[in-house]
Amino acid sequence: MPIIDFEIWKLWLFRSIKAIVIIFLVGFSIVLPVDSIVQAAESSNTALNTFIVVGALVAFGLVSIIIIVGRIIFCRSCIQDIPRRYLPITPNDLPHRGSRKMIMENMEKSKELSILFKKPKEPVIHAGLEPPSRCDDPRYEKLFPDYLNYRSCIKSLSDRLKYQGIFLNNMNIDMKLGETFADVVSNQFTRNTRNKTQIDNSKKFIDLYETIRYSGREVTRQQFIDFVSLAIYFVEVSLTRDDRSPALGELNTGSQLQFNFDNGTWENDVSNYSFPNDAYSNGADYYYPESINYLKRTNSTSTVARKVPSFVPTNPEEEHKMALDPQDPVSHKPSMHTLADSFKYVTHR
């Protein structure tokens, strides 16, 4: 007899005997309380009959509970003995040969597929996060760190403006209560300017910021690149512009010396020196006399040194003449010889 047929016959014999034993056990368990009730009914002793019936029912229930609990404990103890990484593919675990063969073939195939799928064929780019370097186009330079959260960066920029008054990390803004990001951008880069490029970029910057912050959708990589590019543009504008320059269209034509500025800084810096009108046309290559400087040193001899220029106008006419027709203009970078000849030191004891 082949081994396979013997295994089949042995399996069927085991199952048949097991089924017969279970049937007899269930039958006797059912007959026992019924027989006890019948025997007690025929007896004349009521107390004994009650004890027999109740005892039979309690014994049946107790035996059933013991069998069920014992079965559960036995199964769990058997499961604990099996290692967690153990695969039931042996003949004892899975007697069917075809099933074992199919499992082994699929396991080998899954191993090959895991190697193929380890690196995706197409770049996987999730909105809101900077993809890793392997997903970038090798022809372009890596712009941001891997897995950078775009929304967190933009939120950090707005939080610094809201709580610290710092705009684009280089400008301290005295914000008023109720001002928003759009109000700050408009006040700084849209008003008092006629630069069309700057105005258009300001509007794009505001629209892009509001779309990113309040659209409810994840920030795409292109949106974040555009936002960073505009932020860098406005940083350069804020670093290179002159806040003291007059605003176009706001000049006060009624006066040639007073300008109407928003911040009022130049109004306080107007020189009070009384130069003639033609003196401004000479440029900055000429030296105008300054006030006399005194150098005083106190010691045992009480020596006082006074530093005076070699030529000092004695009256307003000579001062005006020197300003209009200077004889020896002084350069901004005088030589050592010129410096030595330009000053005299008079010592008084």
Curated annotation (Swiss-Prot):
Keyword RNA-binding set for record: no
Domain of life: Eukaryota
Stretches assigned to the Extracellular side: 40-49
Topology term for the membrane: Multi-pass membrane protein
Cytoplasmic face residues: 1-18, 71-349
Membrane spanning stretches: 19-39, 50-70
Span list, region Disordered: 312-333
Keywords per UniProt: Membrane, Transmembrane, Transmembrane helix
Subcellular location: Membrane
Main location: membrane
Keyword Membrane: yes
Cellular component aspect of the GO annotation: membrane
Protein purpose: Required for growth under high-pressure and low-temperature conditions.
Family according to the record: Belongs to the DLT1 family.
The protein's name: Defect at low temperature protein 1
